[in-house]
Amino acid sequence: MNIKRKNSLSTLIILSLVLIIALAGCSSNKSDSSTDSTAKTGDTANTDTTTTEGTASDTQYPITIKHAFGETVIPSKPERVVTIQWANHDVALALGVVPVGFSAANYGVQDDSGLLPWTADKLKELGADKPNIFQDTDGLDFEAISDANPDVILAAYSGITQEDYDTLSKIAPVVAYQSQPWVTTWREQVLYNAKGMGMEREGEQLIKDTEKLIADKASKYPNMKGKKVVWANFSATDLSKFHIYTPVDPRGSFLEELGMEYPESVTKQMTDATSYSLNLSAENADLLNDADIIIGYGDDSLYQAVKADPLLGKIPAIQRGSVVFIGNGTPLAASGNPNPLSIAYTIDEYLGLIDGAISKING
C-alpha cells in the first residue's frame, strides 16, 4: 500500500488511524480462517512462522519448486507452515519456525508425546509448549492438515504418493521430494524446505553450520577416515537374507560424510544408481567381507544370532565384533535418518560407538 505524505498534521493522524484499522482487519481475517489454531499450538507465538532472529531471505515471489510430481508455485511468503511425515518439522524448527501442524514421530519416541528428544528441546526453546501434532501412522490425516490452514506443506523428506500429493495440493502448495521417496539427504531437506518457506539464505547458513559441526566432531576421530563401512540389517527370525542401505540412503550418505567409505564389493551391486537399498541372500554374505565396520539396527542378542549363523558368522567384521548394532526404537536409531537437530543431539554418542567398533578391527 502506497501512502503519500501530507503536510497537514491532521491528515497524517487520520491516515495513521485508517492504516491501523486496515491492518487489524487483515489480522482478524487470517485468524478467522483458521479456527482453533492458537489453542492447538499453545499460544499465539507458536503459530508464527518467523525466525528467532526475526529475519527472512529477500525471496522474490512467486517461486517455483520442481519435484517428483511436477512443480509447485508458492505465490507469496508463507505465514502458516505445515510439515508431514519424517523430519521436515525438525528442519523448520532448526530455522526458528514453529509449524502450525506436523506429523508425530512414529519411531524412536520413548513416551506418548509423539516427539523425539531433539524436537521437544527445540520446541521448548522456541516457547511452543502445545504443538499441533498429527497422528498419521495409518495414513495422512488430511482433515487435520486442512484444519491447520497452511500456506505451504513441507514434505521434502517423505514417502507421499501421487494420490497423496494431489489431495494435499488442494489444501496448500506442497514441497515434495525431488526424485524418489525417502532418499532426500539432510542437506536437500534443508535446501528444499527452506526454499518452500522463503528462507533460502537461512537454509544455506544452517547447512554450513551443520557441516562445520560434523567436521569438528569427526576430526576428533582421525582413525575413522577411510574405513570401509556398510549399513546392514539382519533379522533373528530369518537369517537367510539381509538388507543393506546404500550410500544413496541418508543413513549411508551420512556415514560417508563422517569420512568412511562403502566397499566396492557392495557398490558394484547397485545396478540402479538411484537405489537406496539392496536385499541379498545370506549366500552373498561374502559381499561384506571387505567391511571394516558393520552398522545396523538391533541388539546384542541379534548380534549373537548373526555370529552363530553358518554363513553370516563368517563375515570378518561379525567375527571380530567390529559392529555397531543400534537398539531398535531408540532416539539414536531414529537419528539414523539425520537432520540438523538430530545430528547435533546424537553425534557424540554415534561417533563413540563407531570408535569402539574401530578399536576391534586390529584387536
List each model region and its residues.
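Alpha-helical, coiled-coil/dimerization segments enriched in small aliphatic residues
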Residues: K241-Y276
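Extracytoplasmic substrate-binding proteins
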Residues: E71, E163-L239, G336-G363
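Bacterial lipoprotein signal-peptidase II cleavage site
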Residues: L23-T59
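A short, structured surface patch at a secondary-structure boundary
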Residues: H89-A144
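Bacterial N-terminal signal peptides
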Residues: I13-A22
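Proline-aspartate-enriched helix->loop->beta-strand connector
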Residues: F142-I145, N149-A155, P173, A285, ...
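Structured C-terminal subdomain patch of bacterial secreted/periplasmic proteins
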Residues: K195, L288-G363
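Bacterial N-terminal signal peptides that target proteins for export
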Residues: N2-I13
